[in-house]
Amino acid sequence: MTNIRKTHPLLKILNSSLVDLPAPSSLTSWWNFGSLLGICLAVQILTGLFLAMHYTSDTATAFNSVTHICRDVNYGWILRYLHANGASMFFICLYLHVGRSLYYGSYTYTETWNIGIILLFAVMATAFMGYVLPWGQMSFWGATVITNLLSAIPYIGTDLVQWIWGGFSVDKATLTRFFAFHFLLPFIISALVMVHLLFLHETGSNNPTGIPSDLDMIPFHPYYTIKDILGLLIMLTALSTLVLFSPDLLGDPDNYTPANPLNTPPHIKPEWYFLFAYAILRSIPNKLGGVLALVLSILVLAIVPMLHTSKQQSMMFRPLSQCLFWLLVADLLMLTWIGGQPVEHPYVIIGQVASILYFSIILVFMPLTGIMENHLLKW
């Protein structure tokens, strides 16, 4: 008798993508992050759903409702901190996932890669709107500063900002719509994830060598299911340690002060996972230029496949490109550090140099290095 998982209309879809999926035999732990991101998304949707049951999106009560969740709701504190720190875990996994794809040349699967970039933008938008909801000082001023950037768009900028605000400043209308979109976007992200996987399974997974692995495939289950569970346990250990021992480690103390439009915090800065982009934004003295650089810091990933000059897909056997890749990682860490510092000497100039280096590595040095390596290999 044929197994039900291979014949049932719904189960056979799951079977072909989670059980009998042929996968390259050489996948390392760097390929774990896709499943970890899926689990992060599920955790965020579940904790968010339960938080939404107790949260009120009104400027008068939003801050108090979050306090009420932490103090009076059964296990509300753990829900709130799982959701807040789960976002940090989400971004750690996201950045490692993107880094893996850059290193091993997975961006040559352009459809999967482009959907991934859209997903990255969607997750960033969701996280930004979520940060506004507790209605603390940093929530209010973060929302004011970031939405105000749209006023740099010629002609329609000011009208656009007021349209997004629903008035002449960040107020009740803004908070309500941010809550609505923050609730909606994760479900759109879930749909995009399905499309991401659909395109991935059209081509099959890349592998560390970058060489086609059609001759050497193994079933996804049990080999990679077990491997993914190990990654999951490590991530859950890290997340629960963070939540239970220092839940506010990655947060901003200013957000424990209720929003006050009359009092600006000394240093307005976003959550740590946006600091690299924030540093690039601040490095350019012109407002419109800064906004463009901010968007391009992520959008530049879309042209990476066009800039692939090497005849090898992966960086596994390309030491010069590897050096550049790790220089890029160090540069991003430096930008993250700069984004959290005040706008004063020497941080400004360090940020400007790091921003120029970031775009130079991706747009100039990596393609040139690929050409040079081809020449060195006499190809």
UniProtKB/Swiss-Prot annotation:
Cellular compartments per GO CC: mitochondrial inner membrane; respiratory chain complex III
Positions with a binding annotation for heme b b562: H83, H182
InterPro entries, sorted: Cyt_b/b6_C (IPR005798), Cyt_b/b6_C_sf (IPR036150), Cyt_b/b6_N (IPR005797), Cytb/b6-like_sf (IPR027387), Cytochrome_b (IPR030689), Cytochrome_b_C_euk/bac (IPR048260), Cytochrome_b_N_euk/bac (IPR048259), Di-haem_cyt_TM (IPR016174)
Binding locations of a ubiquinone: H201
Membrane topology annotation: Multi-pass membrane protein
Cell compartment(s), UniProt: Mitochondrion inner membrane
Gene Ontology terms, MF aspect: metal ion binding; ubiquinol-cytochrome-c reductase activity
PROSITE patterns given in the database record: CYTB_CTER (PS51003), CYTB_NTER (PS51002)
Sequence intervals crossing the membrane: 33-53, 77-98, 113-133, 178-198, 226-246, 288-308, 320-340, 347-367
Keywords in alphabetical order: Electron transport, Heme, Iron, Membrane, Metal-binding, Mitochondrion, Mitochondrion inner membrane, Respiratory chain, Transmembrane, Transmembrane helix, Transport, Ubiquinone
Keyword Electron transport: yes
UniProt keyword Cell membrane present: no
Assembly and oligomerization: The cytochrome bc1 complex contains 11 subunits: 3 respiratory subunits (MT-CYB, CYC1 and UQCRFS1), 2 core proteins (UQCRC1 and UQCRC2) and 6 low-molecular weight proteins (UQCRH/QCR6, UQCRB/QCR7, UQCRQ/QCR8, UQCR10/QCR9, UQCR11/QCR10 and a cleavage product of UQCRFS1). This cytochrome bc1 complex then forms a dimer.
Extra information: Heme 1 (or BL or b562) is low-potential and absorbs at about 562 nm, and heme 2 (or BH or b566) is high-potential and absorbs at about 566 nm.
Protein role: Component of the ubiquinol-cytochrome c reductase complex (complex III or cytochrome b-c1 complex) that is part of the mitochondrial respiratory chain. The b-c1 complex mediates electron transfer from ubiquinol to cytochrome c. Contributes to the generation of a proton gradient across the mitochondrial membrane that is then used for ATP synthesis.
Protein name in the entry: Cytochrome b
Source organism of this protein record: Micronycteris schmidtorum (Schmidts's big-eared bat)
Gene: MT-CYB
